[in-house]
Amino acid sequence: MKFEALIGLVLVFLSEHAGVYSAKFTFTNKCPNTVWPGTLTGGGGPQLLSTGFELASGASTSLTVQAPWSGRFWGRSHCSIDSSGKFKCSTGDCGSGQISCNGAGASPPASLVELTLATNGGQDFYDVSLVDGFNLPIKLAPRGGSGDCNSTSCAANINTVCPAELSDKGSDGSVIGCKSACLALNQPQYCCTGAYGTPDTCPPTDFSKVFKNQCPQAYSYAYDDKSSTFTCFGGPNYEITFCP
């Protein structure tokens, strides 16, 4: 089952088992250049107080998120203010024209961290997803909690091995992102739609294997759940690192 399809059901379950707890998310940028993280709350919930911010190379900052919550984080790169005064990014742009994304998601390709936070020390679900393509190496690590609580990441720079058909190039011709085959080729066998709309009929493709071989912990395509979804109990905090 796709991660997004779980959001509504999980939030309903969590609301019926309500307690109050907050998770601290610490963001660290180990990339050589500035990254502009974006945040998006799913399931129709209210957006976080910060929906986007600047994070200089070597810098760290934190956000507090109250459970239950489900949503995603990502990094934007190659950002600037254009001649009309609008803030734009070459990868991960959310189209708001501002550093804050204001409830808008990332334009692919973008490496995503996806989470569902439980209340009352329940079970959190989380993953790193490349279903929408790749732009930056990223890692998510729980701190505290109980159970498996394993970190997950895509630490490799897939841009260096991205197939030509999937490459997203910057103004200087360098590869700054790697599109999913679904986005680049728009075929049902890559998008897991139509006759390919089940796990049995939509196996990994040569393109998704490029992502999986580089980042075995991350979702490489829609039906990668078994190896790419992680869990943690007990209300952990989380660290998100760009270019770990």
Curated annotation (Swiss-Prot):
It comes from the Eukaryota. It comes from Pyrus pyrifolia (Chinese pear). Keywords: Disulfide bond, Glycoprotein, Secreted, Signal. N-glycosylated. Style. Residues 1-22 form the signal peptide. It is found in: Secreted. Belongs to the thaumatin family. SUPFAM superfamilies: Osmotin, thaumatin-like protein (SSF49870). PANTHER family: OS03G0233200 PROTEIN (PTHR31048). Disulfide bonds join 31-243, 79-89, 94-101, 149-232, 154-215, 162-178, 182-191, 192-202. Its main location: secreted. Glycans are attached at residue 150. InterPro entries: Osmotin/thaumatin-like_sf, Thaumatin, Thaumatin_CS. GO terms for cellular component: extracellular region. This is Thaumatin-like protein 1.
